[in-house]
Amino acid sequence: MKKLFLGLIWVYQRFISPLTPPSCRFYPTCSNYTKEAIEVHGPIKGAWLGIKRISKCHPLHKGGFDPVPLKKDNNHQHCEHHHH
C-alpha cells in the first residue's frame, strides 16, 4: 500500500502538478508533506496526515512552514530500569 500511495504522489508531481500554477500555501508543499508523512508514519497514518494538511490548503489559511510531525518513540515510555 505504501508503494501505491507514493506512486500516486509521484504521478501527481511528475505529470499533473507541472500543468497547474504553484498554489500551495505551505512549505513543504502538500504533496511533499504527504510523501514524507507516508515515509515516516506508514501509509495509513501518513495518508491521514496528508489529507488533513491538504484540507487546510486554501486561501483562508495563512499557510507557512508546517513540517511532518516526528514519529513518537515508544521505547522510552515504559522504562524498566530503576533509578537510585
Swiss-Prot record:
Q: Which UniProt keywords apply?
A: Cell membrane, Membrane
Xref: SMART domains: Haemolytic
Q: How does it sit in the membrane?
A: Peripheral membrane protein
Subcellular localization, per the record?
Cell membrane
UniProt signal peptide: none
Q: Which Pfam families has this protein been placed in? A: YidD
Gene Ontology CC: plasma membrane
User: So which domain of life are we looking at?
Assistant: Bacteria
Q: What is its main location?
A: membrane
The record, for HAMAP family, names:
UPF0161_YidD (MF_00386)
What is the recorded function of this protein according to its Swiss-Prot or TrEMBL entry? Could be involved in insertion of integral membrane proteins into the membrane.
* Family statement: Belongs to the UPF0161 family.
UniProt protein name: Putative membrane protein insertion efficiency factor
What is the protein's species of origin?
Answer: Staphylococcus carnosus (strain TM300)
